């Protein structure tokens, strides 16, 4: 690896990541393709030092990772070549996990649990926990439901009830047991 000689900012590619859910048509439109279709690439990872982890897609070890535009050089390798120089002394860490993405979902996303770093290491041998924030740019109804986020449990939800809903895979029951927030751009 040779350290880039360009000045800031780095121009990055726009990698798309395969997902189990459908979407992506609006991302195609964002890039001028008015004939785009929803498919299994509904996420554009606009700034990523981490790779997508998808069972059955191990042949794509850098899927989703940002590259310097027009090269096979990952942003991760650039930052690791001089972490302190690029990010400053206070921000330099041995591992840097950053992911900023655009999502265009044509269906409700799966329910997810995001572990903190110690739990991610224990359960998944991953150094990355997951902290999220969202900025809603646009939305459209999905299966007749207006755009929303399910976040946190209803006050009366118990662990035993949630486990029963989970083991029964009672998706409507699980959704009813969560806080629902309408979203607007």
Predicted regions mapped to residue ranges:
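Loop-centered beta-sheet repeat module
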Residues: 166-185
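Generic detector of well-ordered alpha-helical segments enriched in charged/polar residues
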Residues: 76-80, 163, 172
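Transition-metal
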Residues: 1-157
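Short, flexible helix-coil linker/hinge segments at the edges of structured domains or between repeats
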Residues: 155-171
């Amino acid at each position: 690896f040779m350290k880039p000689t360009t000045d800031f900012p780095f121009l990055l590619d726009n990698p798309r990541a395969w997902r189990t859910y459908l979407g992506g048509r609006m991302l195609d439109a964002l890039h001028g393709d008015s004939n785009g279709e929803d498919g299994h690439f509904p996420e554009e990872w606009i700034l990523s030092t981490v790779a997508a982890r998808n069972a059955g897609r191990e042949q794509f070890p850098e899927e989703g990772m940002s590259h310097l535009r027009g090269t096979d050089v990952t942003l991760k390798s650039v930052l690791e070549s001089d972490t302190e120089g690029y990010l400053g002394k206070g921000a330099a860490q041995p591992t840097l996990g950053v992911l900023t993405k655009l999502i265009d979902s044509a269906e409700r996303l799966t329910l997810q649990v995001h572990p903190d770093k110690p739990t991610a290491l224990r359960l998944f041998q991953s150094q990355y926990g997951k902290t999220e924030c969202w900025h809603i740019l646009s939305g459209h109804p999905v299966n007749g439901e207006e755009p929303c986020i399910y976040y946190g449990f209803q006050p009366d939800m118990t662990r035993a009830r949630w486990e029963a809903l989970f083991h029964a895979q009672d998706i409507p029951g699980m959704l009813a047991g969560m806080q629902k927030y309408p979203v607007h751009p």
